[in-house]
Amino acid sequence: IEKEWNQAKWIGKGENAIMFYAPYLPMFELTYKVTLDKASKTSKAAFIYGANDPRLMDSNKNLLGINNQRDSSYIKVELDIAPLQKNQEALLNIYRRGYKKSESQETLISSIRIPTSLINRGNQYAPHQVTINTDLGNTYFHIDNCEKHLAKVNLNPTGKSGGDYIAYPVVGDMGFAVSPRQKAIFEQVEVRDFRRSHQLITSFQSTPLSLDGGKKGLQSIHTPQSNAAPMLRTTFETANKKIAKARIYATAHGIYELYVNGSRVSNAYFNPGITQYDKTQVYQTFDVTPFILSGTKNAWGAELAEGWWSGGATFVGSNWNFFGNRQALLAKMEITYEDGTQQTIVTDPTKWKSYDDSPVIYGSFFQGEVYDARKAEAIREWSTPNYRDTHWKQAAEIQEDGFSTGNDYQLLADMAEPIMAIDTLTAQSMEEVRPGVFVYDLGQNLAGVPLLHFKGLTAGTE
């Protein structure tokens, strides 16, 4: 493939390469280390996640009639070594708050016994790693890298779990809690891919954080940083002679849209489409002759999103990130001049740059799109030659380690019709069924994209 594509590489973001938005991720492995303070004889400390789920903060977004205030909904995982003083096993207590109307206060969901082979009087004040594996509500708890889980707990407030039901909890906001006169250290908080690759998605508290409950206790909740959808760009100079034709050949791990000198190359949606990517990957061909400028600097850019490659693509949790977890672009541009000479530009990580702060915070077929319009101004004209990209970083070659997809696949020209908009429908009626909730009747069923215009909104309005 590299020979046929002039040594083009699969490229993507070099840092924060796995797209991540905490309120939208229901499949994850979460690990942290906690050390209880020996001097103060601390017996308990808790880690918090799944906090401030937006669905549970607006009764219009859940079926449970819940409208929580900030920091009043979360999952709390408490390490409790007090039973060791009574020659009993230490506990991992799982609390839930704000996931049901009856949970205005913390509700104990499960007390998990920890074998003395893992935590005992001899090591009770040593650092202990807690691992939480969540599969669409089904949650597995591990201590200190023990492969066998201590318990499986369904934390979905509906009592149901799996892909046929709305999934709770998500990663959400995370934090820590200690009781009065208790002290603890938390560190190495990491969110990883749930699947076999276990690749790091984001780290939350890499350095030790010392907490002191003082007289009243202490609880703090924080929002982890998101990893936005990848954006890529490069520039190149063309010869000062007439261009006969210019073609782009492109495909992606995920879906992509291409831009040349500020113009979108195609109005097609969801390229390259779905195939069994570990067997067959298709590419598209675009005529970009009208977009290329002769004898001057040109720019070429791409936006990527999950598509069918990664994220949720079926109703089965184990299929999350089925083919891989990082989006990448493979492309080449061939410019043919009227004198018969050719110029080729390919996806070379040393010559392309990537951007970590796209307005597209998250883009997924199953989870939807999160767009922050406040970030749009920073990338205005991002695909034009004179755009200042000094704050962009070097792109990276993307290799999907830990997945079945490798280089043993066929790269074939796409023979299918592109997915295009064929009509624009205007709503025939609109009804405000509840304050702030509107239902639009378009007169027919359809597969399409909504186009809404907003006026008078202040920055930060959701």
Q: Which ranges hold each PLM region?
A:
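Accessory beta-strand-rich segments of carbohydrate-active enzymes
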Residues: D135-N138, E147-G163, P180-Q182, L232-A378, ...
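Extracellular/lumenal ectodomain signal focusing on beta-strand-rich modules
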Residues: Q7, M27, D173, E187-Q188, ...
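Short beta-strands within extracellular/lumenal beta-sheet-rich domains
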Residues: E15-N16, S226-A239, V282-D287, V433-Q444
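Surface beta-strand/loop "capping" patches
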Residues: A328, D423-V437, Q444
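Extended extracellular/luminal ectodomain segments enriched in beta-structured repeat modules
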Residues: L25-E29, A239-R247, P435, N445-P450, ...
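Extracellular glycan-recognition regions
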Residues: I1-P224
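Beta-sandwich interaction modules
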Residues: I18-L25, L118-N120, G162-D164, Q281-F291, ...
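An acidic-aromatic loop/edge-strand motif
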Residues: I1-E2, A46-F47, P54, Y168-P169, ...
